[in-house]
Amino acid sequence: TTTVQYDPSEQYQPYPEQQEPFVQQQPPFVQQQQPFVQQQEPF
């Protein structure tokens, strides 16, 4: 296999970096749930 010729350590770095933004998109998802609870207060 010629896949061993490629540096797996360098190709693996960009992979985890793309996962960081994926986690940052989750915080806003939780903030959207807060307003949902405030709607019950006025109720």
From Swiss-Prot:
Main location (coarse class): other
Domain of life, source organism: Eukaryota
This protein's GO CC annotations: aleurone grain; vacuole
Location of the region described as 3 X 6 aa tandem repeats of P-F-V-Q-Q-Q in the Swiss-Prot/TrEMBL record: 21-40
Localization in the cell: Vacuole, Aleurone grain
Keywords tagged on the record: Allergen, Repeat, Seed storage protein, Storage protein, Vacuole
GO MF annotation: an example: nutrient reservoir activity
Swiss-Prot/TrEMBL Sequence repeat ranges: 21-26, 27-34, 35-40
UniProt feature, compositional bias: Low complexity: 10-23
Positions of region (Disordered): 1-23
Recorded family membership: Belongs to the gliadin/glutenin family.
Entry function: Seed storage protein. Serves as a source of nitrogen, carbon, and sulfur for the young developing seedling.
Assembly with partners or alone: Monomer.
Name of the protein in its database record: Avenin-F
Organism: Avena sativa (Oat)
